[in-house]
A protein has these predicted regions:
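Hydrophobic alpha-helical transmembrane segments that constitute the membrane-spanning cores
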Residues: 216, 220, 292-298
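Juxtamembrane boundary at the C-terminal end of a transmembrane helix
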Residues: 297-305
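Generic transmembrane alpha-helix signature in multi-pass membrane proteins
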Residues: 182-185, 262, 290
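Interfacial loop-to-transmembrane junctions
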Residues: 264-287
Length: 305
């Protein structure tokens, strides 16, 4: 089990680091971010598919196709400025939507798609089914699509190299929290954190995860980001502490949120895609939880600028 876990984790890390390096050194068509479209869709749609499957297993009626399509619309809409650049023109700086505005437009469009599908498929002999499918499809879009859209927003922050360094830092810090919590809990975990949801998680593990996340945050802010992006202002003293803490804390919330759905569905893992790790959602759960708080911390200047 541990061998499979280490193998799958190592393979994922190597593949992701390769794509991030290519995006940094050899951007496709000279446009930063294009290399990451593939993994973005893979992880977003894989997570949405596993969530839909677990909702069905828990006894819910689900519009999986609407949820997946809406998730793709939301995740890709934030890339519109990138697609603009691929057409050979700079994204207009005076565009009223800016970059964040596309998230709002895409979210409304995705939810409308889910709703219209049920308007077309409504059957009065199956009362309640359409409403349940609308609610489940909306949940999939909001829970998966929005955080992945925020990850794209992090990639687009500041100068291209700075945004990429910020995204790498967010992933490294959040996954360091996962690793610290797992191994600290295995070694010295005694007091259960939330036994009714996840019996394996302990307070000792949570503290170990937070500690390692803060350390990883410090190393990223004083080493990785300056090396990649040459920021105009360095990270403040409070930056690594706040960033590491929020990534670890809300990463755990994302983990426990998945545990709740798995409990409802009677499943141990979200899938079997990754030996030793489980499904794709078992990998993205903490990133989904940490995406928005990490973005807000970066906007507040936790990593400098």
């Amino acid at each position: 089990m541990l061998r499979d876990r280490l193998f799958s984790a190592s393979l994922l890390i190597v593949l992701l680091l390769t794509l991030l390096w290519l995006d940094h050194r050899y951007p496709l068509a000279g446009v930063p971010g294009v290399w990451l479209i593939g993994p973005l869709l893979l992880f977003a749609l894989g997570t949405a598919m596993e969530l839909a499957r677990l909702l069905v297993a828990s006894g819910r009626r689900v519009d999986a196709a609407g949820g997946l399509f809406g998730t793709a619309v939301l995740a890709l809409a934030v890339y519109i400025p990138v697609f603009w650049s691929l057409c050979g023109e700079d994204y207009p700086q005076d565009c009223p939507l800016g970059r964040i505005g596309w998230v709002v437009v895409a979210a409304a469009t995705a939810l409308l798609i889910v709703y219209l599908r049920q308007l077309a498929a409504y059957d009065e002999t199956r009362r309640g089914e359409s409403l349940e499918k609308i609610l489940s499809g909306t949940f999939i879009v909001a829970y998966v699509g929005l955080p992945f859209a925020i990850l794209v927003l992090i990639r687009g922050m500041g100068q291209p190299s700075w945004g990429l360094a910020a995204l790498i830092s967010m992933i490294v810090v959040t996954k360091s929290a996962d690793t610290g919590a797992y191994y600290t809990g295995k070694l010295i975990g005694r007091h259960k954190l939330v036994p009714h949801l996840s019996p394996g998680k302990t307070w000792e593990g949570a503290l170990g995860g937070i500690g390692l996340a803060i350390l990883a945050s410090y190393l990223c802010f004083v080493g990785l980001i300056p090396a990649m992006a040459s920021p105009q202002t360095p990270a403040p003293l409070w930056g690594p502490i706040v960033f590491g803490f929020v990534c670890a804390l809300f990463g755990m919330v994302g983990d426990l949120s998945e545990s709740l759905v798995k409990r409802e569905a009677g499943a141990k893992d979200s899938g079997r895609t990754l030996p030793g790790l489980g499904g794709i959602w078992d990998v993205t759960d903490s990133l989904i939880g940490a995406a928005m708080p990490a973005w807000l911390a970066l906007l507040a200047g936790a990593a400098g600028s």
